[in-house]
Amino acid sequence: MNDSSLSLKKWHALSALSNTMLSLAQSGKWDELIEQEVAYVSLVEKISITPFPPGSKHIQDQAMVMLNNVLQNEMTLKTLLQERMDELHGLMAQTGKQKNVNITYGRLSGNVLFPGEINQ
């Protein structure tokens, strides 16, 4: 296999992995997405050290199309991850409020309160 086809094969793999990661995020499969992240970073590193040989304009053009796809997927993925982070932040805030309520009412358990006594 020559250098051009090896480089292009890596770009195809990156594009396919990018599509898979986007699909996982859209399906809410966050743990699986994180597992794929390691392979994604590794593949990007391999691509960065595998330049296209001179005179491979056609292959470079094909790689450019795949790069645009990967970049678009990354932008969409970033938006989905931000939405997930916001959702988790809200859940954590809600859990904190629930904990405060439980602590407050836990201190009052077993006590009979009459109107006006709670402020004393």
Curated annotation (Swiss-Prot):
Region (Required for homodimerization): 1-50
Protein location: Cytoplasm, Cytosol
Alphabetical UniProt keywords: Bacterial flagellum biogenesis, Chaperone, Cytoplasm, Repressor, Transcription, Transcription regulation
UniProt KW Methyltransferase keyword: no
Cysteine disulfide partners in this protein: none
GO cellular component terms listed in the entry, alphabetical order: cytosol
GO biological process: bacterial-type flagellum organization; negative regulation of bacterial-type flagellum assembly; protein folding
Stretches for region FliD binding: 59-97
Role noted for this protein: Dual-function protein that regulates the transcription of class 2 flagellar operons and that also acts as an export chaperone for the filament-capping protein FliD. As a transcriptional regulator, acts as an anti-FlhDC factor; it directly binds FlhC, thus inhibiting the binding of the FlhC/FlhD complex to class 2 promoters, resulting in decreased expression of class 2 flagellar operons. As a chaperone, effects FliD transition to the membrane by preventing its premature polymerization, and by directing it to the export apparatus.
UniProt similarity note: Belongs to the FliT family.
Quaternary state and interactors: Homodimer. Interacts with FliD and FlhC.
Protein's name according to its UniProt entry: Flagellar protein FliT
Organism in which the protein naturally occurs: Enterobacter sp. (strain 638)
Taxonomic lineage: Bacteria, Pseudomonadati, Pseudomonadota, Gammaproteobacteria, Enterobacterales
